[in-house]
Amino acid sequence: MSNITVNIKRLDPTVELPKYAHPTDAGLDLRANEDCTLKPFERRLVSTGLAVALPDGYAGFVQPRSGLAIKQGLSIVNTPGLIDAHYRGELKVILINLDPTNDIHINKGDRIAQLVIQEVPTVNLIEVDELDKTDRGNGGFGSSGVL
């Protein structure tokens, strides 16, 4: 496993820095920097109070926390949320309450998402007249079976 250094800035000095729940986890826990309530099917942009400087060649992906998704119906609208290497603004999370009947209450400091940082290559596209043939072909959207 390789290590990289990422500079992080607290935009609010009371914010807890992201950390891994377990040493081998892929995602760093992001916390809400505000109290809020999401009504059923409501979307909300939630502040984290943090900004990061990702190295060139890396991107951040903001993902839902599985426990919140299954237990409360809390998810992220644009999952994964993409953080480009040169973005320096505040990290915010677009949450949605998918529970049809219950409000979801979020307190400042609650873990609301996870940040996965991955190396991403620069891709050189080459336009061609035909693509190589494969067994799968253009099969997608359930072509390999539903379950």
Positions of the model-derived regions?
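DUTPase catalytic domain/fold
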Residues: 1-147
